[in-house]
Design a protein with these regions (language model features):
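Conserved SAM/SAH cofactor-binding pocket of Class I
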Residues: 138-222
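Conserved short alpha-helix immediately C-terminal to the canonical SAM/SAH-binding motif I
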Residues: 195-199, 237, 264
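Hydrophobic beta-strand segment of the Class I
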Residues: 228-231
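Active-site capping/gating segments
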Residues: 261-295
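A short glycine-rich, Lys/Arg-flanked "PGG" loop and its adjoining helix->strand segment in the class I
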Residues: 239-254
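N-terminal auxiliary segments of SAM/dcSAM-dependent transferases
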Residues: 2-125
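Conserved hydrophobic residues forming the short capping helix/wall of the S-adenosyl-L-methionine
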Residues: 73-77, 204, 208, 272
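Short, conserved active-site loop motifs that form the nucleotide-linked donor/cofactor pocket
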Residues: 113, 212-213, 253
Length: 295
């Protein structure tokens, strides 16, 4: 099956923002390449990249409208003040398209939660693990991006048993699935991209939680409130959706917001402060997680 491939050359400082943007609009996989043309995955939490210029490459489903994709990318890059020109082409499937999966390893978040690529084994150090098995080819946002890592670590320590969760902008469904594996009663995954919802369904089935996962397009408002709301999307979108997101938690419900660069945190906090008692911002690399309890 052919793919639609996007190359975006950017400075190192902008690479993670572009990576998150591509995830948000439905990329199936994302890789980073340095000036030496050596592919790299997003580093594990706490690690640093060593190059100054990066090409961010993403694959989209073959049915993706290239003109609409270009327009969406150019608009979003302009909003992020990133001076970059996307190169979009059709790519025929080859074996090396998934070769980067060889470098994807089991990762732990918090005390219990592990994300493990299909076919790999847990390391000996894992004790009483909660394991999510994923095909990384279906799931960008498999914990390797700092924003996803922040959310997964927060979920690992959250009071989830018996709770209802909404994952707004669910992408591949990793946060909703993690919540269910950690004891949530039901999760609702919401996304504007039909391909993201398909990937979420496949990942949920892989992990045996499909019967407790509701998936819906973001054009349709959620049918009920929830105890925990998670949104790992761009800061500008969080601010625009602040009123809608604030209407979703039950009284005393919790919210976790990510996809936010450190210098955007105060603007996001200001948008949500009228609705939530916000806690101290959590940081990882240049990204933050904002959590709070509904007033």
């Amino acid at each position: 099956m052919p793919w639609v491939q996007v190359h975006i050359p950017v400075e190192k400082a902008a690479a993670q923002a572009v990576e998150l943007l591509l995830e948000t609009i439905g990329a199936i996989s994302i890789t980073l390449t340095d000036a030496g043309d050596e592919p790299q995955l997003e580093p594990a939490p706490g690690e640093e990249r060593i190059w100054s210029e990066t090409v961010v490459t993403a694959l989209f489903e073959s049915e993706t409208d290239r003109q609409q994709l270009r327009s969406a990318l150019e608009t979003a890059l302009d909003q992020l003040n990133i001076n970059a020109t996307p190169v979009i082409e059709v790519l025929e499937e080859q074996e090396w398209e998934r070769a980067w999966l060889d470098d994807f390893k089991p990762m732990r978040f918090g005390e219990r939660l592990w994300v493990v690529p299909r076919g790999l084994q847990l390391p000996d150090e894992a004790t009483n693990p909660v394991v999510m098995t994923l095909d990384p080819g279906l799931a960008f946002g498999t914990g390797t991006h700092p924003t996803t890592a922040l959310c997964l670590e927060w979920l690992d320590q959250a009071d989830l048993p018996g709770k209802d969760v909404i994952d707004f902008g669910c992408g591949s469904g990793i946060l909703a699935i993690a919540a269910l594996l950690l004891g949530a009663r039901q999760a609702t995954g919401i996304d504007h991209d039909p391909q993201a919802l398909i990937a979420s369904e496949q990942n949920a089935e892989e992990n045996g939680v499909l019967d407790r996962l509701v998936l819906q397009n973001s054009d349709t408002p959620p049918q009920k409130s929830a105890d925990i709301i998670m949104a790992n999307i761009l800061a500008s979108v969080l601010i625009d959706l602040s009123t809608q997101l604030a209407s979703l938690p039950r009284q005393g419900g919790r919210i976790a917001l990510s996809g936010i660069l450190a210098d955007q945190a105060e603007d996001v906090r200001a948008a949500f402060d009228p609705y939530f008692r916000l806690e101290a911002t959590q940081n990882l690399d240049d990204w933050v997680l904002i959590t709070g309890t509904k007033r």
